[in-house]
Amino acid sequence: MNRQLFLPLGSEIEKSNLETVFFTFLLSQSIIFLMSEGGSTVLSKTQNQALYELQKELWGYAEPGFLEHKSAKAMSGFLRREGFQVTEGLCGMDTAFVGVWGSGRPVICLLAEFDALYGLSQEADVAEYKPIEGMATGHGCGHHLLGVGSIAAAMIVKDYLEKNKLPGTIKMVGCPAEESGSGKAYLARDGFFADADAAITWHPSALNVVSSGSHQSCIQCYFRFHGVSSHAAGNPEAGRSALDAAELMSVGVNYLREHMDSKERVHYAYTNAGGISPNVVQAEAEVKYLVRSTTNPKCQKLYERVINIAKGAALMTGTTCDVVFDEGLSNVIPNFTLEQVLEEAFFEVGAPEYTEAERAYAKQFRDTYPLDPESEVTAVIAEPKTLIANIQNSDICDIVLRHRCVDECSMGSTDVGDVSWVVPTAQINTACYLSLIHI
């Protein structure tokens, strides 16, 4: 990890860095304001209502990665109306955009995600599973809130800088395809963050707490096996089964698991099993693999081992194999200084105060969800277990929790990691889920 990014709070920091820290402090407050009842007290009632309607609009669109055309148009149009200079089609991605306001330093990038997932269609405000007819996608982890919350933060910072006649540039970055596609990796690759002093993001969660530590590096690819078709009963000796090769590859990878690091993961899914006729030797088969490890070099080494297994499977079956790279994500480099600044802001603003009606609304959803008494609490939380237990037994988290700066790797991946390799980056989580979910 690049330890130069970990600026100690007690050290001598040049003026521009102090401005960056202050600006970050303000920006983090802005995000949290949106979570209070009725929206932000800084924004007008009209603005708050418009933001509320925008998140409903994004929920309704629920567009998957790189296809978020309606969502991106709605968000970029909103930014234009609020006085931001908007540029669309960043780094060859149709649905990537940035809204810029201000001038001079510091330059802070606020990251916004807005893509949805397949298989998660759901009507809004319904506590039971009820997919929308004719719709396959839905927002599974609150990206409709994520994007709109980031816009609200940018608006509040703009208002503050205008009223106080202060220098500084805010960039509200619309980042497509976080769930699958790694939109931020393309932005980082093409130097989009070259002039940025810091990047801040947030994510809906079960808790109000600053995020710390790393996330896994990962590589996603397709293994396409090509064989020879024949009649499986009358002429089996002439066939070379691509499906056999895919299955043997999976067997080999499963034997590999014993000889991997305990924090490494390999997942797979059959995307083409060769057809639906068992009496025909399958000439084509495809498997999608996702390889994860704690750092980029370790992930690359594990990926190469998986490739060798695929080659062996092809050799055993007399088939050939094409390896088609799909996407890759870097591990997250945490920035402990920004984390501490974010936490100071979090505690100054405090958690939202929920009304009884809001708590009753949350309870409707909790009553449909089985309580898991074995649910583990992430190591990033620096609070007594008794306090965490009380939160898990409530409907929604209504306090801010102290976090622990940890140099550990969480299980999971995000393209925020690619941003963290090129600019100091930090993240907060705010309670938008039930307390017992995904802690």
Task: Cite the ranges covered by each PLM segment.
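Polybasic, lysine-rich low-complexity intrinsically disordered segments
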Residues: 2, 13-16, 20
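Conserved small/polar residues in nucleotide/adenosyl-binding loops
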Residues: 437-439
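Histidine/acidic-residue-rich, glycine-tolerant segments that coordinate divalent metal ions
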Residues: 95-97, 117-119, 128-138, 144-145, ...
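Acidic-enriched catalytic cores of C-N bond-cleaving enzymes acting on peptides and small amides
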Residues: 236-272, 277-280, 295-324, 331-384
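Short, positively charged and aromatic/hydrophobic N-terminal segments
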Residues: 8, 17, 24-35
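Acidic/His- and Gly-rich active-site-bordering loop/insert found
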Residues: 38-139, 144, 148-152, 156-168
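Acidic/histidine-rich
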Residues: 355-356, 360-433
